[in-house]
């Protein structure tokens, strides 16, 4: 990008409007290619993205050396995958879960239970001698103490592997009724029928040890936005079954006797009186407030579910949203919007704001754009 533009959007009343455009001193290099459904991790001043639409590729951007742009680093040594989760301990990035084909020739994808570690000093990958005890596709993770990694949510491996096998090995053209029945049976289950991971799971790399820290009082969900503050993590929205989101916001504080706390839910966007909830949203903190931006959902799914339809998103187009929400002192508000609807990219809290990278757009297009979101006290500046 030759010209970096600071786009400040006016607070919405009913439609989005640009307030003004000025030129920014900061320059946020765009990725060399589109990015979605991968992972992001932050080690010191460096942010990393990889997997998903990038295949086995990983890139790093040093926030203290922006002129170098995104640099390609060592390729991932495992199978390509989407929907994985990654967390950092020291100079290591640990990678878990995701879904893909173990071998390119395999008839169907699987949900991976393998664990990999990237050494940021040596620029090298290694496979750890362990497997996760629960499915971690779509799970959220963080390290509360720089020693262990905690996990929330995640698809059930046995159930999802069977669904992927059945749908991948059934010819839709030859057996359309059989194919549709497989979809209807899976998508028509209640949220609890999917048996997503409801426990808080801990992984201690130095001992290769997994522990169960207890059952969550909430429905398990996947694709949540996360905001990490020390030993606390805030889990924002996400899906409670395929196609159905929740507006719920909750916080987990590691080490407490009562670690869970309910927070106020996401408010409805200014264009609707219903908050469907979002999955794959961008999130972080800037100038003392929590920001949640973008995310995907199916408009109308919540009402269909409340009317008793379990396949709640049947026939509904997937919506990629542009709304930005701000939480200040426990209260949510809707403010301005992203330049376009985006979901399933990566986001990082930095000293200058929330850096968002890539994402899927409407029409299944992928974005290579990088923006900085900065709260100025009344609106979120979107710095290109």
Swiss-Prot record:
- Kelch repeat boundaries on the chain: 46-90, 92-145, 147-184, 185-230, 233-281, 303-352, 354-383
Q: Which domain of life is it from?
A: Bacteria
Signal peptide (UniProt feature, chain positions) = 1-24
Keyword Signal among UniProt keywords? yes
Q: List the disulfide bonds.
A: none
Q: Which UniProt keywords apply?
A: Carbohydrate metabolism, Isomerase, Kelch repeat, Periplasm, Repeat, Signal
Q: What is its EC number?
A: 5.1.3.24
User: What compartments host this protein?
Assistant: Periplasm
Could you name the active-site residues? Answer: 239
Please give the GO cellular component terms listed in this UniProt entry. Answer: periplasmic space
The record's listing under InterPro entries reads: Kelch-typ_b-propeller, NANM, NanM_proteobact
Q: Name one GO molecular function term.
A: racemase and epimerase activity, acting on carbohydrates and derivatives
Reactions that this protein is recorded to catalyse? N-acetyl-alpha-neuraminate = N-acetyl-beta-neuraminate
Please name the HAMAP family in this protein's record.
Answer: NanM (MF_01195)
Q: Which family does it belong to?
A: Belongs to the NanM family.
Its biological function? Converts alpha-N-acetylneuranimic acid (Neu5Ac) to the beta-anomer, accelerating the equilibrium between the alpha- and beta-anomers. Probably facilitates sialidase-negative bacteria to compete successfully for limited amounts of extracellular Neu5Ac, which is likely taken up in the beta-anomer. In addition, the rapid removal of sialic acid from solution might be advantageous to the bacterium to damp down host responses.
PANTHER family the record matches: ACYL-COA-BINDING DOMAIN-CONTAINING PROTEIN 5, FIBRONECTIN TYPE-III DOMAIN-CONTAINING PROTEIN
Subunit:
Homodimer.
Q: Return the protein name.
A: N-acetylneuraminate epimerase
Organism the protein comes from: Vibrio cholerae serotype O1 (strain ATCC 39315 / El Tor Inaba N16961)
Q: Quick one: which gene encodes this?
A: nanM
